[in-house]
Amino acid sequence: MMEESGIETTPPSTPPPSTAGTSVAAATTAIATPIPPVLSSPLAAPAFSPLPSFAQPSFSTPVPSSVAPPRSSVPFTYASALPVTGVHSPPVNTSVPAAFSSPLPAFSSPSSFPPPPLNTTPGPVLSAPPMVPPVGGFSMSSTYDITKGHAGRAPQTPLMPTYSAAPVTVLPNPVTLQAPVAGSGSSITFPEEPEDPRVHTVHDEGSAGGIWGFIKGVAGNPMVKSVLDKTKHSVETVITTLDPGMASYIRTGGEMDIVVTSIKEVKVAAVRDAFQEVFGMAVVTGEDGQSNIAPQPVGYAAGLKGAQERIDSLRRSGMIHEKQPAVSVENFIAELLPDKWFDIGCVIVDDPVHGIRLEAFTQATPVPLEYVQQAQNFTPQDYNLRWSGLSVTVGEVLERSLAHVSRTDWHVAFTGMSRRQMIYSAAKALAGMYKQRLPPRIL
């Protein structure tokens, strides 16, 4: 067993006379030259067979002059002396592993390694690994591409040695990595992926507003807005068809507030529908205003005067604010052709805040001459408002003369079109002109 471990031993005996000088040097009790310890590794220490108890003299092995003394300043503690019973005159050039009774002492730096074995020729001195990849063993040129034939990937060949380097900060954009090469002017350039501008565009748009920015962008699309408007109009049409009374509730609201100078539903409903159709949302209410002219105005001037007087009477009485926009409707008769009379409605809008005043007229409805003459005959000669018209309206005459005819809506009996529809058409045209003249912030 001892021979297998590489230690030459002899039975204990009296040293020969030729080695007397050596035995004197062996009188020391400590080993002068420390033997390299065995580092902790999975390999187990060689097992020695038990030997009989003999005196364990200490000996020192002369170190050749060519061997440098160990550099480690950390003393090693041995559990026991080597089981050697004798000394030899020739120096033993074999390394003997020794067992430690304590853990391996920590090395102060990566460059501290165990001393080389005691051979005639000193072993190579180990140094720290290089900080740059080794380039020896192969030649490089500026025209050689190491990525050729690897589909853009780094080749797994000895040309790309594995080495460890300091952590590299990850940059947001692709960069060109260059490995420094000593003694060469060329560099290794990795392929750089082109930057996609769409990625930054999407990122900027997403960070600007997130999900709300996306919704805002979709809602601002003209095509999407048109589809939404059509859908809204379709839903409102279905609701108002099933229940016509719901129209005023659906479209009531917004910044547009209009007062109609009448409490008659035929006028208020027509103006409400017209302004809500043009502005989308509008609040339209009615107040009873007085015209202060004859009940049946005659001529354009009288009709316009009656409509304006209704607005002024409401403002004088304080029923509406002086700056309140108002719409007034006044019907009159006029002889447009010889012995041909027509009923016409005058519709005006007055907005003192923005200085807007507009007029519009409904379509002319023919009135038979005999009914006009009856209205003139029922009016006294000394009537104080004779300058503005007649004291009896054409509707009252028609109601007396014809069955199933109403004084307020006799137009449908003569034309098939109701008075409300006529006022609605004129009011819608008036609302369109009014909208064009309003500042954008009101809309």
Curated annotation (Swiss-Prot):
<keyword id="KW-0963">Cytoplasm</keyword>
<dbReference type="GO" id="GO:0001757">
    <property type="term" value="P:somite specification"/>
</dbReference>
<dbReference type="Pfam" id="PF01931">
    <property type="entry name" value="NTPase_I-T"/>
</dbReference>
<protein>
    <recommendedName>
        <fullName>Protein PRRC1</fullName>
    </recommendedName>
</protein>
<dbReference type="InterPro" id="IPR029001">
    <property type="entry name" value="ITPase-like_fam"/>
</dbReference>
<feature type="region of interest" description="Disordered">
    <location>
        <begin position="1"/>
        <end position="25"/>
    </location>
</feature>
<dbReference type="GO" id="GO:0005737">
    <property type="term" value="C:cytoplasm"/>
</dbReference>
<feature type="region of interest" description="Disordered">
    <location>
        <begin position="106"/>
        <end position="129"/>
    </location>
</feature>
<dbReference type="InterPro" id="IPR026534">
    <property type="entry name" value="PRRC1"/>
</dbReference>
<dbReference type="GO" id="GO:0034237">
    <property type="term" value="F:protein kinase A regulatory subunit binding"/>
</dbReference>
<dbReference type="GO" id="GO:0010669">
    <property type="term" value="P:epithelial structure maintenance"/>
</dbReference>
<comment type="similarity">
    <text>Belongs to the PRRC1 family.</text>
</comment>
<keyword id="KW-0333">Golgi apparatus</keyword>
<comment type="function">
    <text>May act as a regulator of the protein kinase A (PKA) during embryonic development.</text>
</comment>
<dbReference type="InterPro" id="IPR026533">
    <property type="entry name" value="NTPase/PRRC1"/>
</dbReference>
<dbReference type="GO" id="GO:0005794">
    <property type="term" value="C:Golgi apparatus"/>
</dbReference>
